């Protein structure tokens, strides 16, 4: 999959744009240290935007019927994304909980893969959180879904307000976890427990 995406970008156009950007900021793209920079940056962005054109729900290829009706939580799923407003990174951890319906569960790695696909594109943290939850709901139709994303945004660290270490936390709840405050609080306490 990764190789397909890397080959599908318009490398020439991306490299030319990066070359022009270097000129626009007053750099000489032909100096020794920058000679291969347009090529390297185009390749890096091909990797960073690997999720474009993909649907996170398609990552749920393994669905099993199990005698498990209690909450499933996978926490501390590391991710990196690019803020669509400033094109600088934001990164952190995603925590996903779902309450199976009719014993339908998925492979645990599929949750991490859905995070990977949803984060590998120009993104907003709020949308990322919702896209992960919606993908899980569409794939498994669980009784409840809760997604929490904690991230540090370089657009707040490197520029503007310049507040390194500040974290943004977003949550999205579906089904039972949206309807029941008590159920939601119980899952959030498990997600945030060390």
Swiss-Prot record:
Residues holding Zn(2+): 83, 86, 155
GO MF annotation list: GTP binding; GTP cyclohydrolase I activity; zinc ion binding
Enzyme class, UniProt record, top EC level: hydrolase
SS bond partners: none
UniProt entry keywords in alphabetical sequence: GTP-binding, Hydrolase, Metal-binding, Nucleotide-binding, One-carbon metabolism, Zinc
Annotated InterPro entries: GTP-CH-I_C/QueF, GTP-CH-I_N, GTP_CycHdrlase_I, GTP_CycHdrlase_I_CS, GTP_CycHdrlase_I_dom
Assigned GO CC terms: cytoplasm
GO biological process: one-carbon metabolic process; tetrahydrobiopterin biosynthetic process; tetrahydrofolate biosynthetic process
Enzyme Commission number(s) of this protein: 3.5.4.16
Pathway(s) it belongs to: Cofactor biosynthesis; 7,8-dihydroneopterin triphosphate biosynthesis; 7,8-dihydroneopterin triphosphate from GTP: step 1/1
Reactions performed catalytically: GTP + H2O = 7,8-dihydroneopterin 3'-triphosphate + formate + H(+)
Subunit structure: Toroid-shaped homodecamer, composed of two pentamers of five dimers.
Family to which the UniProt record says this protein belongs: Belongs to the GTP cyclohydrolase I family.
Protein name in the entry: GTP cyclohydrolase 1
Taxonomy of the source species: Bacteria, Bacillati, Bacillota, Bacilli, Lactobacillales
Recorded name of the encoding gene: folE
């Amino acid at each position: 999959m990764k190789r397909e995406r890397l080959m599908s970008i318009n490398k020439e156009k991306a490299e030319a744009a990066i070359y022009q950007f270097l000129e626009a900021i007053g750099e000489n793209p032909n100096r020794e240290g920058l000679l291969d920079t347009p090529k390297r940056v185009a390749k890096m962005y091909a990797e960073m935007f690997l999720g474009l054109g993909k649907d996170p729900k398609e990552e749920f290829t393994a669905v099993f019927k199990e005698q498990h009706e209690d909450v499933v939580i996978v926490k501390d799923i590391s991710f990196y994304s690019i803020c669509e407003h400033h094109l600088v990174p934001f990164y952190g951890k995603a925590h996903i909980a779902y309450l199976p319906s009719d014993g339908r569960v998925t492979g645990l790695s599929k949750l991490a893969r859905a995070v990977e696909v949803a984060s590998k594109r120009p993104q907003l943290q709020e949308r990322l959180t919702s896209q992960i939850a919606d993908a899980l709901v569409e794939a498994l139709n669980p009784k409840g879904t809760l997604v929490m994303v904690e991230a540090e945004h370089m657009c707040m660290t490197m520029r503007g307000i310049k507040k390194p270490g500040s974290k943004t936390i977003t949550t999205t709840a579906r089904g039972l976890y949206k309807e029941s405050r008590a159920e939601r609080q119980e899952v959030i306490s498990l997600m945030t427990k060390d």
